[in-house]
């Protein structure tokens, strides 16, 4: 089975590269075998359409070509030539003899150079794809003309975009949105990780420059004796994975068990209990987590009660605490456990609702057959109920794990202004023991303006999430499992 998975993955990768190779092969064929107007399309993009009397398309492609040229000359050339250095002229005030005033010079802004250069590269790449495709289409029109086939008018092409090609029309705006608002920012994040963009190199007053892999070297502990990022990264990554595991599976298993309990015929007033558990969903996390943080703070109501009943003194006597309060959210071990427990309280009701919906659709004939055959409740749960739940909720389980790797709210709202690290190495890297990679990243950008290291960490988070998701889904969808539950 593993060999089949590897073969399917290899086939997918091979098919991807073959499609790219086929695209360039079609372009080469069009250039070699095309007539003069197809070859002229290499220079004038509307030539092939004009020859085949598709004048509207010819005008549109010509206007597109002119727009790309104007964009390149008027906009891109202001930034792309400076991309290799990200600017050399710093901001400073100079005295203007004409106006007799101090004015800012014509300085470089490293961030705008990087951003608009990347934007220009994306535009050029898209224009290149359109250019290649335009030549291929011009050759296709030539072959249709030679074969005596009907060539659509512009009106017929428009009609096809609302009929057989309507899916392309619907996807155009979403794809543009993903390209502009997702792809370009991710590309910017990746490139910033290879610069020294931080508080000491903050545009527009200062310039930043390329530093290669030095940020990743520092992150993985190769930055020398003065670098503590490697030390902090290992510990933050370890806690992130531990947190994601327990936060995912405690709520998943807890939700299933709670759903089974509420669906049991022996449970009285199940609707009332279900409503009480759903209350935690109804209250926004921003409110509930801040309240819980205050309850469990060093001077909160829970510590007051524990001190009154003597629990704090007992824990001090056996060495579990060394202060006059229980450090629920202010000491490493205590905070880790409390965060996971509080997350169970928040997350179990969600999983309970999901599990309830799945259990309502569990094949009753299978359950009845198992009981007739003498299976116990535990055997039914292990052999029928749980496999069915895993099959239906497996994708949600994977996404929950990835979501918990990036679960900013729970960690930040529970520990912000409450937890302070005493580990100097962690503090030097602007991290603490309860940070996830995403909260560490946030603190680096918002509090310390260390965008270079935050970008490097962001890339690591993306790689972890992407690899886990691809591997997990690949394992999950292998074989024909759906037939088992038909």
Model-derived segments and spans:
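Perimembrane loop-to-helix junctions flanking transmembrane segments
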Residues: 83-105
